[in-house]
Amino acid sequence: MKFIDESLIRIEAGDGGNGCVSFRREKFIPKGGPDGGDGGDGGDVYLQADENLNTLIDYRFNKRFAAERGENGRSSDCTGRRGKDIILPVPVGTRAIDNDTKETLGDLTQHGQKMLVAKGGYHGLGNTRFKSSVNRAPRQKTMGTPGEKRDLLLELMLLADVGMLGFPNAGKSTFIRAVSAAKPKVADYPFTTLVPSLGVVKVDDSHSFVVADIPGLIEGAADGAGLGIRFLKHLERCRVLIHLVDIAPIDGSNPADNVAIIESELFQYSEKLSEKPRWLVFNKIDTMSDEEAEERVREITEQLGWEEDYYLISAATGKNVPPLCRDIMDFIIANPREAETQQVAPEEIKFKWEDYHQEQLAEYQFDDDEDWDDDWTEEDDDEDWDDDWSEEDDEGIEFIYKP
């Protein structure tokens, strides 16, 4: 299956249903009064993390997703049905970004975690809501509000404990093949690895960790050289970075300069990522004697001014690889993953009587102290509501305004 770690989609929440203007019309019930119902709320759009997915390929061609609109209100005080929500499944580790404002809406880092990304519109109010002692035959209603619409950028960021860094052909894929069941392609030319891959390293019966391999970086990657730095985002959630260094590059370059280039590209991408714990692991010591390897590594660390610990391994032969894996496991146990996001409590489902509705009602409020009936006369009392109505009256209709 093709690995897709980024997709731009259009999401549209449902509009709220409109309120209804209606009056009760029944035989022997004069002046039935208003009975127009409220509309239904529009459907919401959610993202939900699914551990069974590992790519965003489902959103490569299908780009538009719209929730259902709320139904309009009806007579007899019938409220319109709420629009159906839509839930879009995404891989664990997906980040949602508003493409217009560049605002990060949230990260989905746990299986089953759900996130609201577009809110449905509020329902409109029927004329029943506007009746009062001074407004007994209201002909007002409100319209439903539009649902949220946005262009949503989905970014998949792999969840791994350990991230591999290094120049092309440093031996990253060979290392993963040696310590896990993952089988990334290995060849003697640069950029053999084109997409990130994951491997599970089992240290013993009860301990294991996940390692991520990304395509190699070269000088100028921040400006788009090589495969660029687009895959560095997959290392943002790693707890430790393993910087694999070829102590005998086939192109004759200086390993110390190669390390400095990677450090510079990391910093240009993200200062936070450059500050993560990073271990230097010198690979391919099988290409020379132990004495030569130790002397070469000593020269490299002196040029770098590296004062922390480092490792000498051969990913091809497995030499010194098990001790490195055990040290990584000890580090992971001693440094548990910090919570990426706070688990949001499920949204309380309630009838949405919000400020929007209060404002709409306020526009039609009448002051009870107003002398609205000072000009009343006995003649007005004779002006009844359709007193001459009968079953043969074809002009009697139920809806005065039909949305």
UniProtKB/Swiss-Prot annotation:
Species this protein is from: Haemophilus influenzae (strain PittGG)
Gene designation: obg
Entry's family note: Belongs to the TRAFAC class OBG-HflX-like GTPase superfamily. OBG GTPase family.
Enzyme class: hydrolase
Compartments in which it is found: Cytoplasm
Function recorded in the entry: An essential GTPase which binds GTP, GDP and possibly (p)ppGpp with moderate affinity, with high nucleotide exchange rates and a fairly low GTP hydrolysis rate. Plays a role in control of the cell cycle, stress response, ribosome biogenesis and in those bacteria that undergo differentiation, in morphogenesis control.
Record key words, sorted: Cytoplasm, GTP-binding, Hydrolase, Magnesium, Metal-binding, Nucleotide-binding
Top-rank lineage group of the source organism: Bacteria
Disordered: region residues: 364-403
Protein name: GTPase Obg
All residue ranges annotated as the OBG-type G domain in the record: 160-333
Ranges of Acidic residues composition bias in the record: 365-397
PROSITE patterns in the record: G_OBG (PS51710), GTP1_OBG (PS00905), OBG (PS51883)
